[in-house]
């Protein structure tokens, strides 16, 4: 077991502070899992879902794959173990700016699947470090999960995730972005005087 999860199965991870929050798209996640199993019944034997967050038990019974409701976890080390155990992270948010959960998954080398909404398409480079599904499209969400789990090169995805975080979301990268914005603002101010 990895973080209380089976190590002989592929793991689909869903994370939210409150998994029943409609904005997090749980209904689309449940529908996409149903479609995934209907199109690829063999996945029922080798794939499970881990749900991290409050009210995870309420959702686990709705899924057509075996589910591990992990509840709310605050211990950082345990959270990292859970992310690192996953093969794909799915965030079907209906509205989100720059979700920390995608950064957290990528920092653990886990590719993400999410809808084309808000800042998600800026974080996930389609079919490079994850899959960007059409907005509110459970079929495409299912296709994204299948692509990551069965078609893509897992090592390439992992490497691309780690590179994306290092280049875009590390403290150094963020500081450099702030310096660039500051320099542009100062140049504009001097220009307009």
What is the role of each PLM region?
Residues 6-24, 30-33:
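Conserved donor-binding/catalytic core segment of Leloir-type glycosyltransferases
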């Amino acid at each position: 077991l990895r973080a209380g999860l089976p190590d002989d199965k592929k793991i689909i991870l869903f994370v939210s502070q409150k998994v029943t929050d409609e904005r997090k798209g749980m209904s689309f996640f449940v529908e996409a899992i149903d479609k995934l199993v209907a199109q690829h019944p063999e996945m029922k034997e080798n794939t499970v879902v881990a749900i991290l967050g409050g009210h995870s038990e309420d959702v686990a019974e709705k899924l057509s794959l075996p589910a591990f409701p992990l509840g709310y976890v605050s211990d950082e080390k345990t959270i990292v173990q859970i992310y690192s155990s996953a093969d794909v992270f799915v965030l079907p948010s209906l509205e989100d700016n720059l979700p920390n959960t995608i950064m957290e998954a990528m920092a653990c080398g886990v590719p993400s699947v999410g809808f084309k909404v808000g800042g998600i398409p800026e974080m996930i480079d389609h079919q490079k470090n994850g899959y960007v599904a059409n907005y509110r499209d459970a079929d495409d969400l299912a296709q994204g999960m299948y692509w990551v789990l069965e078609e893509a090169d897992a090592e390439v995805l992992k490497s691309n995730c780690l590179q994306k975080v290092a280049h875009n979301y590390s403290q150094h990268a963020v500081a450099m972005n702030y310096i660039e914005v500051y320099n542009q603002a100062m140049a504009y101010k001097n220009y307009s005087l």
